[in-house]
Structures are given as C-alpha cells and as structure tokens.
C-alpha cells in the first residue's frame, strides 16, 4: 500500500509511518513482528499486549511457531519502533486477560516498559541492532487524543 501511494504521488522516497493506539497499537506490534514493512517510523501507543521478543513464547505473543523465528525477531528489534506509553495508563478496563497477556504485566504501562526492557536486553545479548525508543507521557492514561497531541508523540513522529 505504501509503495502504491509513493508511486501515485510521484515521490518514490516518500517516508511512511505506522501509528496505532490501544487495539491499533496491538495490531501494529503484530505487523511489525510478522510482516515486512518499509515504514520509517512505527509508533505503538498503549497496546493491551505486545509481541514479546521471545522465540520461547508462542504466536501471537512471541515468535515460537513462526518459520525462521530468530531472523524475524532480529528484524523486529531493528525496526524504528517507539513505545509511546501513558504514564497513568494503569487501569485494567478492556485489558487483555489471557494468561500470556497477564504474564506481560498487570497494566498497559507495565507491559510496555517490560517489553521494551526485554527487547533491549535480547538485542544486547545477541549483539543485534536495536532501534526502539521508549517515551512516556506523564499524567496521561488511556487517551489517544492526549497521547498523540503530546510533545513525546511529536518527537516520535519526527515533527
């Protein structure tokens, strides 16, 4: 789709970004983990769950069961992902409660922080490229308008 938009615009090097909040952010973690993307920025805000950087955790929460799971994991960690987290996104309304989700943490903020730290540690352990960033928006809960109008989002969008 991005290639089509670039061709139609006559700008073959036009950058593209993937941005999602809540369920949209959760979907983006799956896109980033399991599909090829040429996005120059991927901003994942407050998802209920993440794709963990683990070949021992089964799909859709990790890479176990995917063909070529380790190369996929390596590519995932090299993507330009910003984990944009609300500093007050600590509620449990509409939070995934499957055992695999609960294992990620008790709320979206905890899950995002833990996933980022695990991703950084795995990349460092293997000597792989790691292009993720973590940005927290203080005082904001599960609110896409406040998240995406924050200075942290502006920076994540490269504006």
PLM features per residue range, with description:
Residues 18, 32-33, 39-42:
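Catalytic phosphate/metal-binding cores of nucleic-acid and nucleotide-processing enzymes, i.e., regions
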Residues 40-124:
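The feature captures the conserved acid-bearing segment of alpha/beta-hydrolase catalytic domains
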Residues 96, 116-159:
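C-terminal catalytic histidine-bearing segment of alpha/beta-hydrolase fold enzymes
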């Amino acid at each position: 789709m991005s290639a089509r938009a670039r061709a139609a615009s006559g700008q073959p090097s036009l950058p593209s970004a993937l941005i999602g909040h809540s369920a949209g952010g959760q979907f983006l973690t799956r896109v980033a983990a399991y599909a090829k993307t040429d996005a120059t920025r991927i901003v994942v805000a407050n998802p209920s769950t993440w794709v963990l950087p683990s070949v021992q955790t089964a799909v859709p929460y990790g890479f176990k069961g995917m063909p070529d799971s380790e190369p996929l994991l390596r590519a995932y960690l090299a993507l330009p992902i910003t984990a944009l987290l609300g500093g007050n996104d600590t509620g449990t309304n509409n939070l995934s409660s499957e055992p695999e989700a609960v294992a990620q943490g008790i709320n979206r903020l905890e899950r995002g922080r833990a996933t980022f730290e695990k991703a950084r540690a795995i990349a460092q352990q293997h000597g792989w490229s790691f292009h993720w960033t973590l940005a927290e928006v203080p005082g904001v809960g599960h609110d896409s308008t406040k998240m995406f109008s924050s200075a942290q989002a502006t920076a994540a969008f490269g504006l």
